[in-house]
Amino acid sequence: MKVAFWNIRGFHLPLKQKGVEALVRKRDIGLVAVLETKLTVNGLDALMKRRFKGWMQVNNFGTHAGGRILILVDPMRIQLEALVILPQVIHCRVTCKVSSCSFLLSCVYGFN
């Protein structure tokens, strides 16, 4: 299972969306956490349909305007359980469906 993090500084731009999609496909990444997305809920819906069809996502958009943390997961390979969602952190349990290996993951974005 491969995991990636990217502080994207604006995931609403098509070039950046394409870059993350290319990285995920080229490196066979099953989970990618994108920080500082600046996405709206509508923008996220469009992104999921266009670039990550069939993937699931967890975000903290409901706790902070401007969408700070977005976790994208391939549900065929990884099970993700969100445990706590706060404005600066998402805590979750990640389980690999192939190996049954499980670990806790915290994705943090600190405000300036």
Give the label of every model feature segment.
Residues M1-N112:
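A shared catalytic/ligand-binding motif for oxyanion handling
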